[in-house]
Amino acid sequence: MSEEFPIVAITGASGSGSSSITKAFEHIFFRERVRAAYIQGSAFHRYDRKEMKKQVLKAREEDQELSHFGPDANHLDKLETLFFQYASTGTGMSRYYLHSKKIAAEWGQESGTLTPWKELDSDTDLLLYRGLHGAAIDGDIDISSYPDLLIGMVPNVNLEWIRKIKRDTSLRGYSRKAVRKMILRRMSDYVHHITPQFSRTHINIQMVATVDTSDPFGVDQE
């Protein structure tokens, strides 16, 4: 923990509502004139989109499953290093995962690729992380020990799946069938690596549906 360079981490799975909490913090920071270093958890994915597909197939050949929910598809060591360095000096290295064609075009890259690693601005007041592993523990890696405030977006899985299906099909170019397969492939890592983090957070928030979410895949036409 660091009084001089505090870290806030918002942790939750795809579709959990973490982006809404992030926006709330952005409004607070703007009003209070707080300069934040915004970190996306996807920056620490180990593979770009094309290579990830290859690695998923390779894992299946070995009777294994690989997903971004688990540690093997991510640089958790680099994320821990960032948190350690920022808490100590207010600096560190990060990058971006370019999810959509629109964002990728701004970088002159293809969607699903990663930008080069870059040093954070040295004049920030705090670091705000939003991603899958803000409270993760894996072997000797203990990311949960660094944030001064850990917020968990706890599961409401049917609502999460509905939001993920809508986002990935409308913004990221996936078919509904592909998103459904992705959800199924991630289930083991969801149980073993995502949900345990919510016992380490300081505050947990759960989104409540105001519409029928009984069958997230009921409108699947493929």
Regions found by a protein language model. Give the residues of each.
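NTP-dependent small-molecule kinase module
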Residues: 1-2, 121-123, 188-222
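Short hydrophobic/aromatic beta-strand immediately N-terminal to the Walker A/P-loop
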Residues: 8-11
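The conserved Walker
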Residues: 14
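Conserved lysine of the Walker
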Residues: 18
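Post-Walker A alpha-helix
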Residues: 21-22
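Post-Walker A helix-loop "phosphate-sensing" segment adjacent to the P-loop in P-loop NTPases
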Residues: 27-37
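Conserved nucleotide-sensing/catalytic segment adjacent to the nucleotide-binding pocket
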Residues: 37-40, 44-103
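ATP-dependent NMP and nucleoside kinases share a basic, alpha-helical "lid"
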Residues: 111-170
